UniProtKB/Swiss-Prot annotation:
Name of the protein described by the UniProt record: E3 ubiquitin-protein ligase BRE1
Organism this protein belongs to: Candida glabrata (strain ATCC 2001 / BCRC 20586 / JCM 3761 / NBRC 0622 / NRRL Y-65 / CBS 138) (Yeast)
One GO cellular component term: chromosome, telomeric region
Keywords from the UniProt entry: Chromatin regulator, Coiled coil, Metal-binding, Nucleus, Transferase, Ubl conjugation pathway, Zinc, Zinc-finger
Top-level taxon of origin: Eukaryota
Pathway field: Protein modification; protein ubiquitination
């Protein structure tokens, strides 16, 4: 935002002379800049959290997509398995898994897996494969736990890195602040060469322990605030002479020069720690890349390693250039932050003005909305009354039309009776029709009167309902206005409570800062020892990482061998599938031949019936009655159903190939007798096939 906005020059702070004692204005400006630095750090943390949230949200969407695909696969498997089930409980379990969605119970999934194993074992799969898969699952869980521990270690290191960089940014902000320099009486001097040379004699090849880097920054703050307290105490004391004041001033100046030299040496150590940390990060990245390449290539060449080492050296050189550019960007960032303060003040004032105008507009709109709602309710009640009246008129017109039609029909019948010769039968029919017509008309009149009464009751109720609705809406509008007033009052009360809490928090923070300054004095003496210990710990970490890399390589080789075994098992399963498909084709061919035989037998039967009907063939048929009876019985056994011996065979079972009639098959399915009566093989409704003989 600050790069796109026009640069606004910040007003220069009016600080007192450094030779004079501190004033109240200096302390207030110092506190304001400290608050600004705190707000800026919180803003940076918020931006980082938003980025993390976006990445986590994308991963969540991917997981939802994969879960949906897995659930679709599970539902298809359950629907296929439902046809093989014989018991009702198993079918209900399959239906639950089909309609489960994303909420699946663990106990029900275990039952479904047991059912799946039951039917897969019946189809010919072996238990050895299941045991091998279970062992592989245990190994995968073991590797998962190891990776989880590594993830914890890496997250701890990342947290320490974040804390370290936050401390660095805070120290840079404090160094560039004019109020900090004024309060702690910092001046740019070049008399610190002796102290810097003493600090350079210390060991520089220390490890990048991030917590110790942060304590250096804290020591700087601690010494500066101690000097401020001592300076204010000395200036406020009344019984001190001018000579003693000068001596104290010289002592403070000497302390400040010592602290500045110590600060410069600490900054150099921090830079060396940063370089060493970045080198370690690059080496870790390179090792991770090598591990990922080992998944595709088992043996790596020495030439590639040498190239990687050259690339690391080039990256080191580019890293030094980037540190210089980073420092220049930090200075620019601080200038832009100062300009941003003034711009934000202007924006806040404009925002308050626009907010007040919008509140006034909102009140006017709320009044208009109440007026529109009242008119709307009145119109709705009128429309309901009109609709009730129109429905009555339509029904009356329909009844009149029905009566007119009946009268026309009656006149036509009378006219026909007058033209035709009179007879007793017709007179009786006419009398019956007349009596029926009278009964019908009386019934219609009764129904019509009942309907009118019902409609009048409904119209009264609708009118009362509209009145009640109007009262309800009026009460709701009054309730909304009361709720708005309550919200405004609660907001004002919350703001007052927040101000009280903020004042209490500031008091607590000042007390905590004083206590932390006393504690940091003791910690500053042990910084050098901690740096040496941290160097040793970092070397041990590097050794552990190398050992872990070798373990990961071994795990990769083991997983590749397991992968090959699984591929072999898959090929065997595909071969079994192909053999089953060939068996199905053979069964279909047999079925087609049986159908052809049935067609030939039908033709033969039709010919025999034709010959039986001829008079010349009666003599010959009497001779061959026994043979024909046998042939007819054989034909019936082939064509008619063997269960009922009434219907034709028109339904075949796919699992075994036996043929029965459709009625018998449906009766057996309805009675839950789902086994073939000839071979006792199980079948379902999906295994039935229509056959046309």
């Amino acid at each position: 935002m600050s790069s796109e906005e026009p640069p606004i020059k910040k007003q220069k702070l009016e600080l007192s002379d450094p030779d004079e004692p501190l004033t109240q204005h200096d302390v207030i400006s110092f506190q304001k800049e400290a608050l600004f630095r705190c707000l800026n750090s919180k803003r940076v943390e918020l931006e980082a959290l938003t980025k993390q949230y976006s990445t986590v949200h994308d991963k969540w969407e991917q997981n939802v997509h994969t879960l949906a695909t897995l659930m679709s696969v599970l539902s298809t498997a359950a629907s296929h398995l439902r046809g093989l089930c014989n018991e009702e409980s198993e079918k209900t379990l399959c239906d639950e898994m089909i309609n489960a969605g994303e909420s699946v119970d663990k106990e029900r999934t275990d039952e479904f897996l047991n059912l799946l194993r039951k039917y897969t074992n019946s189809n010919g799969s072996s238990d050895s494969k299941i045991d091998s898969l279970g062992l592989e699952l245990q190994r995968a869980n073991k590797t998962k736990s190891e990776l989880r521990l590594q993830n914890k270690k890496l997250t701890d290191e990342i947290d320490s890195l974040k804390a370290y960089y936050h401390g660095l940014v805070r120290s840079y902000d404090r160094e560039d602040s004019m109020t900090v320099k004024r309060v702690f009486n910092k001046q740019k001097t070049d008399d610190n060469t002796d102290n810097i040379s003493n600090t350079e004699q210390r060991p520089t090849s220390v490890s990048p322990v991030l917590t110790n880097g942060a304590t250096h920054v804290k020591n700087e703050v601690k010494t500066e605030q101690e000097a401020l307290n001592n300076h204010t105490d000395s200036s406020q004391s009344s019984g001190i002479t001018e000579e003693e004041k000068k001596k104290l001033f010289l002592q403070y100046e000497n302390k400040i020069t010592d602290l500045e030299s110590h600060n410069s040496s600490l900054n150099r150590i921090i830079e060396e720690l940063e370089n060493y940390k970045q080198l370690n990060e690059k080496e870790l990245a390179q090792t991770r890349l090598e591990i990922s390449n080992l998944l595709s290539e088992k043996h790596s060449n020495e030439e590639e390693r040498e190239d990687l080492l050259h690339q690391i050296e080039k990256l080191k050189a580019s890293n030094t250039d980037l540190t210089l550019t980073n420092e220049s960007f930090l200075s620019k960032f601080q200038e832009l932050a100062k300009e941003k303060d003034t711009f934000q003040e202007k924006i806040s004032s404009d925002f308050e003005k626009t907010l007040e105008s919008l509140k006034a507009q909102n009140l006017a709109l709320e009044k208009d909305l109440v007026r529109v709602r009242t008119t709307r309710d009145e119109l709705i009640s009128k429309v309901a009354i009109l609709e009730a009246e129109t429905s009555k008129s339509v029904l009356i017109s329909d009844l009149k039309q029905a009566l007119d039609i009946l009268r026309d029909q009656w006149e036509k019948i009378e006219f026909r009776n007058n033209q035709s010769p009179s007879s007793d039968a017709l007179l009786k029919e006419i009398q019956d029709l007349e009596s029926a017509f009278k009964e019908l008309s009386s019934l219609t009149h009764k129904k019509y009167s009942e309907y009118l009464n019902h409609e009048s009751v409904i119209s009264k109720l609708t009118i009362e309902k509209t009145k009640a609705d109007q009262k309800y809406f009026a009460s709701m509008r009054s309730k909304d206005s009361i709720l708005v007033e309550n919200k405004n009052l609660s907001k004002s009360l919350n703001k007052a409570n927040e101000l009280i809490l903020q004042l209490k928090d500031t008091d607590k923070l000042y007390k905590q800062k004083i206590e932390s300054l006393h504690k940091q004095l003791a910690l500053s003496q042990n910084n050098e020892k901690r740096l040496v210990d941290s160097n040793k710990a970092a070397n041990l970490k590097v050794m552990n990482l190398n050992s872990e890399i070798q373990k990961q390589k071994k795990l990769l080789d083991f997983t590749s061998s397991q992968k090959n075994e699984l591929i072999n098992e898959l090929t065997e399963a595909n071969g079994m599938l192909k053999s089953k498909e060939l068996e199905i084709e053979f069964k279909e061919n047999e079925l087609q031949t049986a159908l052809k035989k049935n067609e030939k037998l039908e033709e033969f039967l039709s010919k025999e019936n034709y010959n039986m009907n001829k008079p010349s063939s009666l003599a010959t048929t009497n001779l061959d009655e026994d043979s024909m009876a046998e042939e007819l019985e054989n034909f019936r056994t082939l064509v008619y159903c063997s269960l009922c011996s009434k219907n034709w065979k028109n339904m075949a079972i796919r699992t075994c190939g036996h043929v029965f009639c459709e009625d018998c098959c449906k009766e057996r399915l309805a009675a839950r007798m789902r086994k073939c009566p000839t071979c006792n093989k199980p079948f379902s409704s999906n295994d039935l096939l229509m056959v046309h003989l």
